[in-house]
């Protein structure tokens, strides 16, 4: 099976970057059957050195939450002819229609108010609208959703009316 992983957060020392790094590191140790294509930015491309010959680096120099991510990245993914893609964050391109799973860490952005932002009012609401559009797209189109806690799973079900069976809780581990 040809599996892609969105590792554009790789090389960040905390949060999703650490989750990305540890997931790939541990997958390399346990899976010698599937072929993995690790999509990295230019900044993180040299930081990741595959330790398993079934893992391959792919340059995907599209900034998070950008036009390129939404409208150019999907075409790079289509050219890779993947059987499954794992987005490690909710920012799934709107134009991506192949089979994928998505990890949802939390729904914090959903609850932010203008008071939590220094953005101009119009820009704040435009950004929030895009967030709602992108996360709803990811949740509705995903074959499976990985939630990092039971609380996150309950919130996804509550706000997006998703069948509980579509969501798998996989807790993040401590090292």
Q: Which residues does each PLM region occupy?
A:
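Carbohydrate transferase catalytic cores enriched for Leloir-type hexosyltransferases
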Residues: 1-175
């Amino acid at each position: 099976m040809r599996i892609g992983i969105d590792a554009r957060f790789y090389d960040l020392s905390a949060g999703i970057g650490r989750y990305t790094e540890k997931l790939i590191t541990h997958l390399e140790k346990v899976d010698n059957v599937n072929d993995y294509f690790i999509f990295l930015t230019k900044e993180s491309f040299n930081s990741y050195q595959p330790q398993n010959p079934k893992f391959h680096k792919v340059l995907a120099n599209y900034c998070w939450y950008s036009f390129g991510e939404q409208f150019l990245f999907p075409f790079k993914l289509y050219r890779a002819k993947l059987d499954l893609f794992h987005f490690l964050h909710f920012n799934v391109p709107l134009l991506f229609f192949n089979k994928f799973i998505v990890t949802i860490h939390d729904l914090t952005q959903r609850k932010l108010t203008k008071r939590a932002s220094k953005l101009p009012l119009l820009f704040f609401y435009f950004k929030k609208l895009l967030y709602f559009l992108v996360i709803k797209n990811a949740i509705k189109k995903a074959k499976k959703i990985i939630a990092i806690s039971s609380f996150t799973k309950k919130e996804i079900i509550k706000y997006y009316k998703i069948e509980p069976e579509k969501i798998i809780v996989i807790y993040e581990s401590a090292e």
